[in-house]
Amino acid sequence: MKTTIQKTLMTARLFSGFWDRWSVHGVEDHVVSEIRPQLGNLEVWTDHFNKSGQLNENLAHSFYEKHLVNEAEYYYRLSALYYNLNQWIYPKQNDDKTYWFQKCLISIRKADAISSIDTRYVSIEISNHTCFGRVRLPANPVGCIIIVNPIDSSKEELFKYEMDFIRQNFITISFDGPGQGETYTFQGLKATQKRWMDFTDTVIEYAWSFFPDIPLYLFGTSSGASWAIYGSCNPKVTKAVAVSPAIRSEGIDLPAYFIERMNSVIEDKETILPNLHQLNIHKPIFMFHGALDVMTSSKTIYNLYDRLPSDKKFLEYEGEGHCCNYKLEKIRKLSMMWYLE
């Protein structure tokens, strides 16, 4: 019987779509093409991405010595993404996952240390456990965006989101919630629907307590999009963007490796998603959908959109699947324009 890691490696070797998420978040094409044919065991994976991480870390150091700080910052973040791939491959909390996540955090903090944007490492308490977050503070903020990450992603993976939002002078707040990233790896806190409700509410209250005079926006993808819609019901939130929201009770066939990964981080096997049909949604929502999405059907998305208040927007991409991966950069630009309308 194949383990979850073996199933993940097989999927990565056989299906190019596996890599879409990682490619749009920064993983280089040549790094993927070099490893795919060789993906027979875990050691090949960790060795390859460790070398890629070290290579980019060295490149970042070289740029920094030449006073090319922006380039150095980017390549430190890219090196962290490769180390993040190594922690991600382990579905369950263990020493190896912890080791690679620590390497990821070291690279991220090297990037933060040389960045012109102030970064603060923060935390909140959920179910007597610490949830770890980061806040980035441009000098003259026009708004504050809470990035709600998909359950299978860490905040470090989505560094391009931060970069795009910060360039346009938005404060960014990004936490790893129950079952996610740094919080799961170091605290062992698993996801339940109730914990995610508490987490979303607490992050919004946290943002409001520090930035009460700045418009508060939400940006979420996949399960994070569903929780962004939930969060939009909070009166402190101004607007929310939902990219490919995951809908509960959807009769879909998810890949075996993904189901097993989720079972490792979810305590309540029923669902960790909010029941969107029970929410009193009244704030503006901009929803994005990929027509080729096999995780959430177009019919389900259309039905949800019809229930939203009149001040809403919808954009569907014919050639995109779940999370609209290859349109994410454009989606972030459109979202920032819409936030400020």
Regions found by a protein language model. Give the residues of each.
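Short beta-strand/loop motif that positions the catalytic acidic residue
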Residues: 280-282, 287-289, 293
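Hydrolase active-site cap/lid region
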Residues: 225-272
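Catalytic histidine-centered segment of alpha/beta-hydrolase-like enzymes
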Residues: 320-329
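Short alpha-helix in the alpha/beta-hydrolase fold that links the catalytic acid
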Residues: 161, 283, 297-306
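Alpha/beta-hydrolase active-site loop
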Residues: 190-211
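N-terminal cap/lid segment of alpha/beta-hydrolase-fold proteins
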Residues: 49, 53-56, 92-138
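Short beta-strand element of the alpha/beta-hydrolase
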Residues: 142-150
